[in-house]
Amino acid sequence: MKNDLQKNWGYRPSLGRRLIRTFCKLIINVFRLNGRSKFSNEFIQMLDPKFETQFDGRDLQFRTGNGRLLWRAKTLLTEEPLMISWIKNMNPNDVVLDVGANVGMYAIPIAQRVKMVYACELDPLNIAILKENIVLNAVQDRVVVFPIACGDSMKLVDIKFRDLAYGDALQSIAGGDVLDSHLGELPHTTKNLQMSLDELFNGIDAIRPNKIKIDVDGNEETVLRGLVNLLSTANEIYFEDSFTVACKNFIIFLVELGFQEQECAEIFSKDGKSKSLGFNRIFKK
């Protein structure tokens, strides 16, 4: 098994960040800000950590509160340039399905320019932040949250989490590819509700998406089995290809449906451009 320092996916705090955390723990202990008293609870409640930015002339606010959430907000415009370009080309009549929405870093700016966004996310902690971001940006009339694991059928499944943290990613649905990632302080497994998105849309009165974003961190195979009909009726797909067999099969299926790759951008490890981890790809009919 690879040493943790050699893992490619996920976040590992730098020495500087770890020193900051040690200092913060000291302050918390000295002033007893650990939530065990009325004062500390009121103090924590009054904290309102947010990051404000602009995207294409529109104001955005994102809930922060930990290093990962702050990083997501600060790198909105630089982490995935292809995604930013894709969003800028959307129009007011588009309906977008975001499979793997996390805390809404892309669902929110998309919602500011399209008719409707369906945001799918399986991590309850991320869903809480996603809801805050939706309300902070006043797009609750254009975002519907599906708090489920997307898969091939409705059932309870085991989900492996790297950590117990807001803004985390790389969760693994039972049977999916486990990406080679850093583990946090509290890796764990819980049972979650899984649903097929095809079955979900067949059972509700909702406009079908014409654009679909898929970023599911190794869970492509089970997601695909429950997304066949929606993929067939869409005209644009934004897909994160992690160089797995499941990703390869997903792309083959898109081509069989008549999609052609229009653009791609390489994904690199977080420690710089030392290792290619895959490609973000845009497919169109």
Locate the predicted segments by residue:
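S-adenosyl-L-methionine
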Residues: 1-142, 182-187, 202-206, 257-285
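Short internal loop-to-helix segment that lines adenine-nucleotide cofactor pockets
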Residues: 74-95, 142-144, 156-158, 174-233, ...
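Short, glycine/acidic-enriched loop or turn micro-motifs at the edges of active sites
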Residues: 101-103, 124, 150-152, 216-220, ...
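Core alpha/beta nucleotide-donor-binding catalytic domains of modification enzymes
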Residues: 131, 135-138, 143-163
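S-adenosyl-L-methionine-dependent methyltransferase catalytic module, highlighting the catalytic core
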Residues: 149, 162-178
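Conserved active-site loop/cleft motifs that coordinate metal ions or position small ligands
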Residues: 211, 236-240, 262-264
